[in-house]
Amino acid sequence: MPRERGGGGCWLLPALLLLPPLCAPALAISVAAEDAKEQIERLVSQESEKSGKSNKINIELQEIVFVIQSQSNSFHSKRAEDLERNILKQAEELGKELPRVLLIHQMDRHDGAWTILPLMHDFSASYGRNSSWIFFCEEDTRIQIVKLLETLRRFDKSKEWFLGKALYDEESTIIHHYAFAENPTVFKFPDFAAGWALSIPLVNKLANKLKSEPLKSDFTIDLKHEKGNGPHLTPVPEFCTDDLNSYKAVHCATMFSNFLPVCGDPVKKEDIFVAVKTCQKFHRDRIPIVKQTWESEAALVEYYSDYAETSIPTIDLGVPNTERGHCGKTFAILERFLNQSSSKTPWLVIVDDDTLISIFRLRKLLSCYDPNEPVFLGERYGYGLGTGGYSYITGGGGMVFSREAIQKLLASKCQCYSNDAPDDMVLGMCFSGLGIPITHCPLFHQARPMDYPKDYLAHQIPISFHKHWNINPVKEYFTWLAPKMEDSFTEKKQRRIREDL
């Protein structure tokens, strides 16, 4: 007789109703009773196994501390809070106790919290005895909790683990200080977009090490690479950056949900004023590249130089050219924007004459930001963050200012200590002193496309790159940044084309 499987205490009646007519009633009752006993034992075993598995998941979930690498800007903090709610909702639907979810920008007023290491002591003190993992992710990382638990279960939580999706340089690059020049592929570092995890034994070890070897005053340039400079990264294939709807995402515990944030209609061309820093010696080789590539995307653009040349045209700001730093020139641009440009222009972008940029994509991105807030946006670097330093936007990838940010900056009287001071770092110091946070966007790039891992760029729609050295800048622009690509290809096709380059 086929045996009916079911849950709860209601299985016996349907089973008995399905019994066929038997010639020996006593025997039939005996057989049915034996059948019932077997099924009860099986059901009890199944329920016990299910309950045990459920309790195990509950315990495992409580042992993970989720840390979202969030930012205080209103757009980014909202996205981080949305992710926090998603994590808690998944846990609630599983019927489990809610895990701890931390947002980095809420954890520490210290400007270096985003570099993670300054938080190791707090992680160790707060969670070193009652947790097994610290799981880090970005605001656009999407997590499937059950699959994440299944993935972490493969690793002995009593050992030191550094887990993530592995990236590597294909050739040595300036942004990583030409590290591992003989074979840069041997060094693996995590892609933050896929999420990454530290076991508590490793967190405790790092916290103890930082007690005896305090963080030095130094530059933070590429955090994910510098975080990989220590215990070896163990690649985890379930930590993914595939799109949520990709067929590849079936096996993934994490995915990445956004390539280029868009929050409505792109801002108008006339709402962005672009200032190009140049000098006479580059009028003939760099400015023509700008005119062949992105200049036509901008409605308002001016070239600022040490020499006025009407054919371009350039504007002499009366600040002598310097071989480095350019702080005097940058602050003169800020003054000019505030005092001479239309008061209705809400955004200023300052770029170098060898910056390649997509104004079309920038217009989309800026739809997510409120120009009435003091916004200072670009690729974030840091200096001396372990010892009370500051963050700054690196100038080569482009610096984006809201008018409100410039007004607050100039009203503060913070200024250059010399014309050749590093403008981006001085701006970082000034905004830090004002309590205005730097807003990081990884779509801005200080270096060339070839200086970044292919897998890292594959989940981006980049906004800028920098430097013409050893490349064909016009070709690179039309490969990576030209607006016609949005009309001609889907994001997936773009990525496939880039992989073939």
PLM feature segments, named:
Residues 2-501:
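Secretory-pathway lumenal glyco-enzymes, predominantly type II signal-anchor Golgi glycosyltransferases
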